[in-house]
From Swiss-Prot:
Glycans are attached at N38. The lineage of its organism: Eukaryota, Viridiplantae, Streptophyta, Embryophyta, Tracheophyta. GO terms for biological process: iron ion transmembrane transport; manganese ion transport. Signal peptide: none annotated. InterPro entries: NRAMP_fam. This is Metal transporter Nramp2. It is a multi-pass membrane protein. It comes from Populus trichocarpa. One of its GO terms (molecular function) is cadmium ion transmembrane transporter activity. Keywords: Glycoprotein, Ion transport, Membrane, Transmembrane, Transmembrane helix, Transport. Probable divalent metal transporter. The chain crosses the membrane at residues 76-96, 104-124, 161-181, 185-205, 213-233, 259-279, 305-325, 347-367, 400-420, 435-455, 465-485, 492-512. The gene is NRAMP2.
Length: 536
């Protein structure tokens, strides 16, 4: 406490200092310290890295157990960041390719589905944030304690496979953008290397604080928004058709594949793990019910705004290609590789050629998604395996997992657009297969009182979440079946696929069967004190 004899200058200095200092140690903080010493686990963010949420209501609000402060724009700003990083997965090159194909083949008719798919994605991501805030641990850490060793190693492997598949798409998307912006001078493999090095450069900013890294993402999202909004303005889409597409549900038999792609891109397995870790970048005491409730409120607002922005960006891309290519002979052949060429032929040059505007937006999408992919890889590997490594070491390991196969892919498929399209389909299938292994553990944990305490979801929300999860899994299952029927040839290959399917379904049944069981002893022991404290 400041001395009464101090002048106004000293009070101002203390206020400035208070805005940067950590919250005072309380009994719960000491309890957390003891817990971390006992467990010595890998954590998403060290205490010194976390952003302090400074109270503006007065000292009484800090100690009050059930006092939830009124809404504050300043606090909303302090909580802003994780939701926008999470929203990058809704804007990666794979999603942009789904947008342009939906627009070219289905016109404006699937915009309503894009809207509701984004809403479904928002619900899943809010549950992910809820787990991270209420428990003080992220999803991969909780899975490590919830499941037996063999099951968690399978979950870790599946999460890594999904991440590598997404990363290959994202890095190649950046490489395509670099190829466009260099007028074809740089080949795909060179773009892959540039993207990899840029990713490490951006991650270096994390050493200067989480806020700096979040600022970089804000610039990249703004770049995407401006680029694709500019393209939409150049295309001059029909406002009437746009509104009809958003408000009136329509689904034709010829657009089912595109509809499946729109919904299937909503849930990215690595993003479910990522968001539960990102919310821990703010200093929140999970043992104080009011603090957790306040954080959940602000994170819900921030995530909603972030995904509204992502919806608008996806809307811009879809409408540009709906206006320019719907009903044309080129519609069925447009992909991420040749989209720039088709845009240039359709809309021409001008003061700012649309080809380069598309390249800038695609580059921002690719760069931002590769950074979040590396970020997610650190949390997934550290959480499942409990690796206490330096962040640069973890980044190097997780980056190598994706960059090496991506360079091989870029060299092999450098000159073949058709081969890249087939590869992209296989990667979509690969990621679709991993969705249950992120959704089922999330919904299992978020509904358990032993894990969540008073913040477990209620029966209505639980049924809604499971309905969405089953819907997404079935839709992606349709994509898998359709793909395998058309692509899988030969008896031996069919036998291998069939055997793998049996093992795949068996593991999903095992995960679902765990929904009603109690968590492991280690997790129960750690969380029993939190439940008691939250109930006070």
């Amino acid at each position: 406490m400041s001395s009464p004899s101090g002048g106004e200058d000293s009070k101002d200095d203390e206020k400035d200092e208070e805005s940067n200092r950590l919250l005072p140690l309380s009994s719960s903080s000491q309890s957390q310290s003891l817990q971390s010493e006992n467990y010595s686990d890998e954590v998403a963010f060290e205490a010194r890295e976390k952003i302090v949420i400074v109270d503006v209501e007065g000292p009484h609000s800090i100690d009050a157990v059930d006092y939830v402060p009124p809404f504050s724009w300043r606090k909303l700003w302090l909580f802003t960041g994780p939701g926008f990083l999470m929203s990058i997965a809704f804007l990666d090159p794979g999603n942009l390719e789904g947008d342009l194909q939906a627009g070219a083949i289905a016109g404006y008719s699937l915009l309503w589905l894009l809207l509701w798919a984004t809403v479904m994605g928002l619900l899943i991501q809010m549950l992910s944030a809820r787990v991270g805030v209420a428990t003080g641990r992220h999803l991969a850490e909780l899975c490590r304690d919830e499941y037996s060793n063999w099951a968690r190693y399978i979950l870790w492997f599946m999460a890594e496979v999904a991440l590598i598949g997404a990363d290959i798409q994202e890095v190649i998307g950046s490489a395509i953008a670099i190829q466009i912006l260099s007028n074809g001078f740089l080949p795909l493999w060179a773009g892959v290397l540039i993207t990899a090095s840029d990713c490490f450069m951006f991650l270096f900013l994390e050493n200067y604080g989480v806020r700096k890294l979040e600022g970089v993402f804000a610039v990249l999202i703004a770049t995407m928004a401006l680029s694709f909004a500019w393209m939409c303005g150049d295309a001059k889409p029909s406002g009437k058709e746009l509104l009809k597409g958003i408000l009136i549900p329509r689904l034709g038999s010829k657009t089912i594949r595109q509809a499946v792609g729109v919904v299937g891109c909503v849930i990215m397995p690595h993003n479910v793990f990522l968001h539960s870790a990102l919310v821990q970048s703010r200093k929140i005491d999970p043992q104080k019910k009011a603090r957790v409730q306040e954080a959940l409120t602000y994170y819900s607002i921030e995530s909603s705004v972030a995904l509204f922005v992502s919806f608008m960006i996806n809307l811009f891309v879809t409408t540009v290609f709906a206006k320019g290519f719907y009903g044309t002979p080129q519609a069925s052949s447009i992909g991420l590789v040749n989209a720039g060429q088709y845009l240039e032929e359709k809309y021409g040059g001008g003061l700012f050629p649309i080809l380069y505007i598309w390249g800038i937006g695609l580059l921002a999408a690719g760069q931002s998604s590769t950074i979040t992919g590396t970020y997610a890889g650190q949390f997934i590997m550290g959480g499942f395996l409990n690796l206490r490594l330096k962040k640069w070491t973890r980044a190097l390991i997780t980056r190598s997992f994706a960059i090496i196969p991506t360079i091989i892919v870029a060299i092999i498929f450098n000159t073949s657009e058709a081969s890249l399209d087939i590869l992209n389909e296989w990667l979509n299938v690969l990621q679709s297969m991993q969705i249950p292994f992120a959704l089922i553990p999330l919904l299992t944990l978020v509904a358990k009182e032993q894990v969540m305490g008073v913040f477990k979801i209620g029966p209505v929300l639980e049924r809604l979440a499971w309905t969405i999860a089953v819907l997404v899994i079935l839709i992606n299952g349709y994509l898998l079946i359709d793909f395998f029927i058309s692509e899988v040839k030969g008896l031996l290959f069919g036998f291998l696929i069939g055997s793998g399917t049996v093992a795949y379904v068996s593991f999903i049944i095992y995960l679902v069967s765990r929904c009603g069981t109690s968590p492991s002893n280690g997790l129960s022991l750690e969380l029993s004190e939190r439940i008691t404290c939250n109930g006070n």
